Structures are given as structure tokens and as C-alpha cells.
């Protein structure tokens, strides 16, 4: 492991020198590739430096503890030595996690689909709540979040389905754990007897695809246009600017109505369709690994009930890892980072154990 870490550090220094060369900016494609590799290695190098520094301090403390004659200085050296011996295994574990193979899609932007499930109008309201939760989390992360398409429910404020695009650093790697069925328990505003109702909404997180990821034959596509309910200004409900694309071999559908022109909506819908087809490819790869890896955390099983939001008890529970928080109002305001970090750590621990067994 440490030979590999030393090689990574040397590569990081090489990249730093290459990026500092003014000529590097002449080829923007190469510059972006080098800059991404540099950024990807930076966290590993920083963790390795912390580990190496702690090891060096430990050796110095051991030497001082043996060589020092002053009892007080000897005791100080021993105290520092014990502290470092306790801290170093954690730093080593951090390095092992950082060296785990990365999911090639982790750095990509995502398309997120939220659909109301069982529960009628209450499920549609919950879908809208989830949308706002993710929008606020994206804002906290410094990501860009846009609504691509939506289908409002019959009642005010709800969505039968809504599609978002979220762009930024490591978006898929962070949000991929959100795929699945989210269940809510609360008293609807229309409930006169105070009874708690259970509703559900499903979330699908798809990594944005690039043209090289999927091959689409134009003959396999059907394009339909319709009147938009989006932000088309004077065109709204007058011109058919909204676009729906159907991939006939699979039956997959992607639609966009939020842009001002038909061409822009067509481009956005095409991106959504590519993401859906790429997701099928990823799901097939994950299924191939399913026999070796039983954890549901990153399986992306869309039918799995992953989380319950209990409003009367102000509690949110993630059933995959047994995580419980009693700060539901803050959670719904987008403060979901603690849970996402716990899911990441659980996933990484599972992968470390899998690597140790291999």
C-alpha cells in the first residue's frame, strides 16, 4: 500500500509541475484532464502526508522517551507516544478507504426523478417536500439545481412526478444513496380525526451520461411536442415548445418543458434519456456484483424502502444502516449531510471488508 501511496505522491508533484507550465493551457482538453487527475489525487496525498507526519512524530517520541533522563520530559514523551499510537490506525484506515477503486460515475452530475407513490394527494405533497429538501441540500453544497420537468397533482402544491438536474462536484457520488422508496408518516391537513396516514414517494438518482457511454440510433426514437407549462414567457400554452422523447426498444421516456425553446427542451430531454439508458447499463453491472456484495446501501434498488420520515415523533430513520435522527424539521430543510456521511462510511467499510476477503 505504501509503495502505491509514494507513487501517487510523485504523480501529484508531476501534475503540479505540468499544470504550472504556461503552455499547458494551450490544450484545454488536456488541461482539464490533468487538472481533474490532480484534484482527484489531492485528498489522498494530504491524507498520506498526515499519516507520514504522525509516524515521524511517533518515532521521535519513542526516541525521546528512551533517551530522556528528566522524569517530567519522559512522561510527556510517553503521553504523546500513546496519543499517536491511538491516532495512527485511524489515519491508516482513512488511507485504505481513499485507495478503494472509485465508481467511475461518482464525479458526474445527476438527473433526479421523484415520483409520488401510494397515498394519493398526501404522497404528491411529500414528493414536493423531498424536492425542496434536495434543492436546499444542493444549495448548501454549492451545487446548481434546476427543474427539468414536472407533473402537478390535482391538489395545490403537490407533484405526481418531478425531474431535477443537479450539477457540481462529486454529485452522483454523494446522492446515489438516495435512490429508493421514501415513506412518510404524518397527519394530513385534511384529516379531521387526527389519524396518522402513511404515504410514499420514490427517488431515482441517475448519473448524467456522455455520448461515449451509450449508443442511440435515431431510428429508435420518437419525438413528440406539446404545449409547455414552464417559463416560456409569451409562448406558454401557445406554442408547442415542450418535448417528449420515447426510446422505442426500451419504452423509456424523457421530457422537458422548462426551457424557452423547443430546441433547448429537446437537448435537455435527450440528456435525460441518455442518463436513463446509462443507468440501465450501470444497474446490469451492479447486478453482476450482487452475489458477491449483499449490502443495499449502494445497490440502487429502486423498490427498496430505504427511509421513514415520522412527523409526529420528529424522527427520520434510514433502515439500511439503522440511522435515526430526531431533528426531522432540520432534515427537511436540507440538513441531510450527517446521514449521507454515515451511508458513505458504511459503504466504504463494506467495500474494505470485501477487499480483505478477496
Swiss-Prot record:
PROSITE patterns the UniProt entry points to: RF_PROK_I (PS00745)
The GO terms describing molecular function are: translation release factor activity, codon specific
Which SMART domains does the UniProt entry name for this protein? PCRF
| Segments passing through the bilayer | none
Q: Does the keyword Cytoplasm apply?
A: yes
**What does the UniProt PTM comment say about this protein?**
Methylated by PrmC. Methylation increases the termination efficiency of RF1.
The cross-references to PANTHER family, in alphabetical order and at most eight, read: LD18447P
Name this polypeptide is given: Peptide chain release factor 1
Native source species:
Chlorobium luteolum (strain DSM 273 / BCRC 81028 / 2530) (Pelodictyon luteolum)
**Corresponding gene?**
prfA
Amino acid at each position: 500500500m505504501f509503495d502505491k501511496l509514494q507513487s501517487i505522491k510523485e504523480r501529484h508533484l508531476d501534475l503540479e509541475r505540468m499544470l504550472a507550465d504556461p503552455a499547458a493551457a494551450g490544450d484545454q482538453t488536456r488541461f482539464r484532464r490533468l487538472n481533474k487527475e490532480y484534484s482527484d489525487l489531492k485528498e489522498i496525498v494530504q491524507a498520506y502526508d498526515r499519516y507520514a507526519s504522525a509516524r515521524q512524530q511517533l518515532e521521535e517520541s519513542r526516541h525521546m522517551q528512551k533517551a530522556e533522563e528528566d522524569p517530567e520530559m519522559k512522561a510527556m514523551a510517553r503521553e504523546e507516544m500513546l496519543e499517536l499510537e491511538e491516532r495512527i490506525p485511524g489515519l491508516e484506515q482513512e488511507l485504505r478507504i481513499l485507495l478503494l477503486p472509485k465508481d467511475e460515475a461518482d464525479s458526474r452530475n445527476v438527473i433526479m426523478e421523484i415520483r409520488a407513490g401510494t397515498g394519493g394527494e398526501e404522497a404528491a405533497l411529500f414528493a414536493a417536500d423531498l424536492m425542496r429538501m434536495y434543492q436546499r441540500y444542493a444549495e448548501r453544497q454549492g451545487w446548481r439545481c434546476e427543474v427539468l420537468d414536472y407533473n402537478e397533482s390535482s391538489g395545490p402544491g403537490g407533484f405526481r412526478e418531478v425531474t431535477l438536474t443537479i450539477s457540481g462536484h462529486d454529485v452522483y457520488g454523494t446522492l446515489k444513496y438516495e435512490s429508493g422508496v421514501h415513506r412518510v408518516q404524518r397527519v394530513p391537513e385534511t384529516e379531521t380525526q387526527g389519524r396518522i396516514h402513511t404515504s410514499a414517494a420514490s427517488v431515482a438518482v441517475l448519473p448524467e451520461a456522455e455520448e461515449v457511454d451509450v449508443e442511440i440510433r435515431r431510428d429508435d426514437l420518437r419525438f413528440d411536442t406539446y404545449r409547455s407549462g414552464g417559463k416560456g414567457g409569451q409562448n406558454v400554452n401557445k406554442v408547442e415548445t415542450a418535448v417528449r422523447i420515447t426510446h422505442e426498444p426500451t419504452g423509456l421516456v424523457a421530457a422537458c418543458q422548462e426551457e424557452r425553446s423547443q430546441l433547448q427542451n429537446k437537448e435537455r430531454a435527450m440528456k435525460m434519456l441518455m442518463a436513463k439508458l446509462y443507468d440501465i447499463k450501470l444497474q446490469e453491472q451492479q447486478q453482476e456484483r450482487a452475489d458477491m456484495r449483499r449490502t443495499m446501501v449502494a445497490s440502487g434498488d429502486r423498490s427498496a424502502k430505504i427511509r421513514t420520515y415520522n412527523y409526529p415523533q420528529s424522527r427520520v430513520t434510514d433502515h439500511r444502516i439503522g440511522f435515526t435522527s430526531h431533528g426531522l424539521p432540520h432534515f427537511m430543510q436540507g440538513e441531510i449531510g450527517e446521514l449521507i456521511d454515515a451511508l458513505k462510511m458504511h459503504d466504504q467499510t463494506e467495500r474494505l471488508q470485501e477487499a480483505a476477503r478477496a
